[in-house]
Amino acid sequence: MKQLIILLVVFLNCSYLSAQWKPAGERIKTEWATKIDVENVLPEYPRPIMERPDWMNLNGLWNYAIAPVGQAAPQKYDGQILVPFAIESSLSGVGKRLGKDNDLWYQRKFSVPSKWKGERVLLHFGAVDWKADIWVNQIKIGQHTGGFTPFSFDITPALKNGENELVVKVWDPTDNGTQPRGKQVNKPSGIWYTR
């Protein structure tokens, strides 16, 4: 059976919401950054050698909330974040640091095209730094640990007709944890960092 992919490279296609989004600050503003279209962020298929004819890009505006580690999913979200950009980045529209004591919650709604009926639907993440828990329609789909590796889940059993809800909880201790990292540190310094 042909598999379909929903990509999380990760949220809404609403003109009202896109009018509300703006970069968080003016740090490292490039020509490319000024041309971001929140309704069509990074529209290209991310894995050309594995391209499928039917797929959905979930990049865009998502709801987000920052909560202490271990709390249940929020009932109310703090605002909008532009996925796939990290919360610390200007292009996320948030520009905040989290730290090891907080979880970052993402939420969005999506509808599966009717022509996908009877097909398997995969939810694919290019990477989530560092630990991610995923729910579709309040059904836990799975968990992944590792900030540099892509992963997928078959979400077919959790889908319903019409609107579906996707929730992702992320925890990243940055340099307070034991996971491998590049330049990610809580107190950046030296010649490799901009301020």
What are these regions (language model features)?
Residues 26-29, 36-38, 87, 100-103, ...:
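Extracellular/oxidizing-compartment recognition motifs
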Residues 53-57, 102-105:
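Short coil-to-beta-strand transition motifs
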Residues 20-55:
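N-terminal pre-domain segments of enzymes
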Residues 60-83:
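Predominantly extracellular/luminal regions of secreted and cell-surface proteins
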